[in-house]
Amino acid sequence: MGREGAFLFDQYADGSLSSTKGIYAYWALLTDVLSKERMDAFVAELDNKETFNRLHRVPSLAANHPKYKDNGRYWQGGVWPGANYMVITGLLQQGYRKLAYEIARNHYDNVLKVYKNTGTFWEYYAPEHEEPGFMARPNFVGWGGLAPISGLIEQIFGIRSNVYEKKLTVDVNLTEAYGIDRYPFGLDGLVAIKVKSRSSATQEPQVEITSDVPLELTVLWGDKQKTANVKPGTQTV
């Protein structure tokens, strides 16, 4: 891999570099190969309206590439739920929570609009229209189910768990009330979470949690956080 500015490109057998910007480069988000300075510049490309910040984020091919298609045409710009999940997970791992939420919300909203229009979930989606991708397969709840299930719970509701360390995070971005019931936590645990409505995104959230197992709860909002040790039963953090 090499760089043009801060992007990562495929290297051919002869040592030369491709000039194609594709979503596959963002697997690097799940590694520690880049310095913080380079990572910041690399991630910033996801907000570039000339390349990856399109109507439906994130296209698999940069929009300024000559082979980019507005209907996706599979990997010529198509928005793939699995690839998006990789990008969003990587952004969260690297600490870019705000951008991760923006992309997750954009993807979820577009998938929901297509679902309302067609009655189903699709293999992949068009980057420039609220439509399935060109020749995408319908009723595709393999990776097509990532946005309405994992995307909603982990990225929009912000409920993420580390069962091995007995830790649960609620990353609150919404201002309206929301919650989840019977959230599985490990082999035996069940958790219910209710986040109360807020008047603004900067207001400290109040989270009611009911758990039948002990765990450590961290609540995030903006650049702030609070942590509590939760015992079996119900309490508000």
Label the predicted regions.
Residues E176-L220:
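Carbohydrate-binding surface patches
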Residues R137-F185:
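Catalytic cores of secreted or luminal carbohydrate-active enzymes
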Residues M1-V79, L112-P132, G151, F157, ...:
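Extended glycan-interaction surfaces of carbohydrate-active proteins
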Residues L30, Y85-Q93, A147-F157:
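Short glycine/serine- and small hydrophobic-enriched flexible loop segments
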Residues D32-L46, L91-A104, R160-Y164:
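Structural helix-adjacent loops and short alpha-helical linkers that scaffold large soluble proteins
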Residues M1, G78-V114:
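Extended amphipathic alpha-helical segments enriched in small hydrophobics
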Residues S19-I23, G78-M86, F140-A147:
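Aromatic- and histidine-enriched alpha-helix N-cap/loop-to-helix transition segments
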Residues L217-V219, K226-V237:
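C-terminal beta-strand-rich structural cap/linker in extracellular carbohydrate-active enzymes
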